[in-house]
Swiss-Prot record:
Binds 1 FAD per subunit. This is Trypanothione reductase. The active site is at H461 (proton acceptor). It catalyses: trypanothione + NADP(+) = trypanothione disulfide + NADPH + H(+). The gene is TPR. Keywords: Cytoplasm, Disulfide bond, FAD, Flavoprotein, NADP, Oxidoreductase, Redox-active center. Belongs to the class-I pyridine nucleotide-disulfide oxidoreductase family. The lineage of its organism: Eukaryota, Discoba, Euglenozoa, Kinetoplastea, Metakinetoplastina.
Amino acid sequence: MMSKIFDLVVIGAGSGGLEAAWNAATLYKKRVAVIDVQMVHGPPFFSALGGTCVNVGCVPKKLMVTGAQYMEHLRESAGFGWEFDRTTLRAEWKKLIAVKDEAVLNINKSYEEMFRDTEGLEFFLGWGSLESKNVVNVRESADPASAVKERLETENILLASGSWPHMPNIPGIEHCISSNEAFYLPEPPRRVLTVGGGFISVEFAGIFNAYKPKDGQVTLCYRGEMILRGFDHTLREELTKQLTANGIQILTKENPAKVELNADGSKSVTFESGKKMDFDLVMMAIGRSPRTKDLQLQNAGVMIKNGGVQVDEYSRTNVSNIYAIGDVTNRVMLTPVAINEAAALVDTVFGTNPRKTDHTRVASAVFSIPPIGTCGLIEEVASKRYEVVAVYLSSFTPLMHNISGSKYKTFVAKIITNHSDGTVLGVHLLGDNAPEIIQGVGICLKLNAKISDFYNTIGVHPTSAEELCSMRTPSYYYVKGEKMEKPSEASL
């Protein structure tokens, strides 16, 4: 088979892989090949042009969460004078899925056009795997023994194959779905269990809760003590209260031991505690794993660390001409991070000024109902890195919810600082529009803003965000790792 020659071969057409390919082809006039298994979203492989984010991640999920929020908006509108016949209201799940599918397909098509219209950029449909450090095979399937469709020779290889939902090895796992399949359910489940305490489980619990039938019940189980491990503890506690107030059943310290299929098609879940419950749908959302299995990395000697491709701060692997970005590296599994890593890598490889991605102070969100916005360190981490940490905390009922009837919807804002110089180390928000607010806050943290910069800024009134400009007095401190309400002057 005759080989095709490229300057760069990218395995994976996700956000990071496409950014790298586009930049290399347009900014540096390189000949670039991109390999992926599917061009448009949906089964059997789910991920297609645009990767997880576009097809079975951020984009469709945000659309579905937006749809789910209308349930509460309609209920709350009565407090503002709106009257309507509630008996005629019904949620059309099929329409939600249809418009979601159309939106995702439009993005898929835009990437198809990019390949068609960009000189030097070529797409190959199939499974990419390494034959050597300079040769990538495009195969018919994931099976390393499957037929080779194309043989690509290249000076540089970029691994951008992303991640995949992790499914636990328990009896009956074949009766469960992952988040991939959840985007294509023909109808909303009546009794659903989302397994896991991370953002995917929490977000889908909110979606299912809004669209469930009237006699439906959403249950979330998590093996730990509180959902959203690694996030600010105050936000975790308050979100748990609000999810419960919205009717979601949260079971902590519970983990499925086995799943059995009942005669009526429902699933019987036996938990490790011995508890047994029946559900119509069980969705596993216990994390994602770097997608390295089918890459045949051993053929080029590429090393793995903690399940992901091992890279340095410039996204270089241990093999001089092979690089990796995004989820497959198991660093920060966020789309904007992968895009930034891609742009930096292409400049490093083909440009004259090597640069790297700063993985600190990355703003992110959980699109739960209500949502979370977060950037920087949580107090438990900050207190171990800095001698004295000051924590500013505020919680309140937003103006609209004094009228909407949802007074339980507390907005929480927390600012964490290095007390010695006032530098803001972290900001954590829970409540309406928190993800939108945190983006601007992220810029502040990148500029090393101090708490005085926050409270010397005039806020926009009336908004929840203005609370960030009003917090002048610490609520409590950490001194050498110990939490204190009012430490002595000497200790500060």
